[in-house]
Amino acid sequence: MRIWDRLQAWVSRADQRCYYWILTLALLLPNVVLSVVMQQPAVGRVLNILLMLPVYMLLLLSAKRPGRVYWGLFVLVLLHAFQLVLLTIFSGSVVAVDMLLNIFTSEPDEAGELLSNILWPILASGGFYALTFVVATLSARSRESLSPRFRRRMALVSVLILLVALPIYIGAKKRFPYVHLRAEVYPMSVFYNMYLATTKLY
């Protein structure tokens, strides 16, 4: 009962800024984890966070109540949850072409066996992001909204982070021509793999 009381107390004190940062960090979580465990150049680890953090910040700033935007990103959030589950099977890997093809071509028995092996990661990842949708709902239904001053300030911070990331990428591209955003930065890498998977299916 104490936990429930504390939760109610937190909900009563939380404002849109609190919701905003919780949802931003929830969107960024796969990038942070991949930057730690994924085998990629150091510049790729940095860009994985520096490029996507301001993008997520700006997306959630596009509405006075960030929870509404978060619900609009439902498919992306599902992809995040799937990516975190995948890391428990293939440490340091993003959703790849062969993995996507296996989803459509695997036998029901094989799929059932795989699901039984990753049941706990699915529950953990699904539970975490279910809680973020609760936060998003609280944000969307709240009478309060992000103040214009906060939105302007965070938008400026986001642009500044992008301006820092841009020369890092340009410098890395000159030194390492093989560095591509579609390969180094999640979820761009997954979307590119989805494109490759569709071309192989048809």
Model-derived regions: residue spans:
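Transmembrane and membrane-interface helices of multi-pass
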Residues: 2-188
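Membrane/wall-proximal cationic-aromatic binding patches
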Residues: 182-202
